[in-house]
Amino acid sequence: MMPQLRDSGNHSTAPLDGRTRGEVDAFIRIFGIETEYGVSVTGADAPCDAGQTAMMMFQPIVAQARSTNTYIENGSRLYLDVGSHPEYATAEARDPMDALALDAAGELVMRDLAMDTQHRLREGHGRRAIVHVFKNNADSAGHSFGCHENYLVRRFVPLETIEHELLPFLITRQIFTGAGRVGGQGFQITQRADFLDEAVSSATTRSRPMVNTRDEPHADPDAFRRLHVIIGDSNRSQWATMMKLATTHLVLCVIEQAGREGRESGFARFAFADPGAANHAVSRDASGVGAVFDMADGDVIRGGAVAVQERYLAAVERFVEDHPEVGASLPRTDVHDVIAQWHEALEAFRSGDVDALADRVDWVCKKRLFDALQARTGHLPASRLEQLDMDYHDVANGTVYASLCRRGGMRTLLGRDAADRAVHMPPDDTRAALRGRFVREAKAKGARYSCDWTRLTLMSPHHSEMVLLDPFDFEESERFRQMMDMLA
């Protein structure tokens, strides 16, 4: 039985102002990615605890911000999560490409912290100590950590609708967004399937749901809710990161428009009888077409994840044709190109040419590499495959992924310059622009300050505070200019 969902009741029935009403009526969206990183040290003269190493990584942060929880110049959040996992949450983005740039910036931030820590570790633990920072979702000890996506959705979409209509899409999209994993049960196309135990929940630490329903919109609670997607892997592939955000956005547009018009979207018939079983089946079906799904309405869908994805894609394609204004919802991503690439990916599975996706899908790339090495050597121990798997995800000292990119084995959508720029510059069309400027100026002046997603607080040399409730609003208000003047 699926868990019952409830709103938190923290919103009123007050009428929305004109600007917010326009945002609700449009197809625009806010995107964000939260990534928990794994940490380990090899080559040291004495054992180095992962938690202590993570704390060492954050020593420069604590020295400057007096906390392991801070916001940086690009508007993103940097902090130590439960279990001493360094975590980076991207600033608000209006477009998947902006979210991708911020995500790539997070890799660079983590790499810099790791290399600084490595330099300091070698002074006391030997010159061969190496700090590894893994952008993946499972370690060799069986611990899991997450990559969570955030989507701002309209309040009028019931939580039950999200559960029944979006979850089958999220489960089956993993054929092109999965990062892949070598484990005790062989190769799986996802990293998280063995660790997710519920479909929907309001907790992420006590349980491991696929979708989290805590009502923390970080926006006007009368107008929006924040969809917190747990089911998803940490991607090295830039294409996979862009596609998971863009395709999910388009499916949400269909669901939201049906809600506006008071009708069914048609996606309810794709609900699985057992989402957990479906998730495991997808993860173990590298063909993409072999799994068989029992549906909640008693029907059976054959043809694997591809068959379900084709149904979603057909509905999205019709919707975009009928609502051309959806194209304007993403300022830097062409929705027609997204649809074309979605088609191309599914056709590769349908035709049996899965290797054609090795230059853009993480799990396909890794599996082809591992299969080639096995064929060349005759046999590689499982421990060596696991080592290569981890190296692929090591943003600090890994060589496998970087080598693939250099040789054209993995396509990139952004250059290093764009990632470098995103380390310091937030998107200019969300409130992150204001937060980023505030943080930059406060740090430059040595002022004491704090902030969160919706609030800026200046504590010295003067005290001032302001609320930034609208994530789409990047315009400098009189209040904001006054705060900047206090820092001048």
Curated annotation (Swiss-Prot):
The pathway noted for it is: Protein degradation; proteasomal Pup-dependent pathway; Protein modification; protein pupylation
Any other noteworthy remark? The reaction mechanism probably proceeds via the activation of Pup by phosphorylation of its C-terminal glutamate, which is then subject to nucleophilic attack by the substrate lysine, resulting in an isopeptide bond and the release of phosphate as a good leaving group.
Q: Please tell me where Mg(2+) binds in this chain.
A: E34, Y79, E87
Q: Which residues of this UniProt protein bind ATP?
A: R77, T90, W453
Q: What is this protein called?
A: Pup--protein ligase
Upper lineage is: Bacteria, Bacillati, Actinomycetota, Actinomycetes, Bifidobacteriales
Q: Which HAMAP family match?
A: Pup_ligase
Going by the entry's taxonomy, the superkingdom of the source organism is recorded as: Bacteria
* One Gene Ontology MF term: ATP binding
Identify the keywords attached in UniProt to this record, alphabetized: ATP-binding, Ligase, Magnesium, Metal-binding, Nucleotide-binding, Ubl conjugation pathway
Q: Could you tell me which PANTHER family the record lists for this protein?
A: PUP DEAMIDASE/DEPUPYLASE, PUP--PROTEIN LIGASE
Q: What does this protein do?
A: Catalyzes the covalent attachment of the prokaryotic ubiquitin-like protein modifier Pup to the proteasomal substrate proteins, thereby targeting them for proteasomal degradation. This tagging system is termed pupylation. The ligation reaction involves the side-chain carboxylate of the C-terminal glutamate of Pup and the side-chain amino group of a substrate lysine.
Reactions catalysed, semicolon-separated, are: ATP + [prokaryotic ubiquitin-like protein]-L-glutamate + [protein]-L-lysine = ADP + phosphate + N(6)-([prokaryotic ubiquitin-like protein]-gamma-L-glutamyl)-[protein]-L-lysine
- Assigned protein family: Belongs to the Pup ligase/Pup deamidase family. Pup-conjugating enzyme subfamily.
Q: Which GO terms describe its biological process?
A: modification-dependent protein catabolic process; proteasomal protein catabolic process; protein pupylation
UniProt xrefs under Pfam families: Pup_ligase (PF03136)
Catalytic residues? D81 (proton acceptor)
Query: Known EC number(s)?
Result: 6.3.1.19
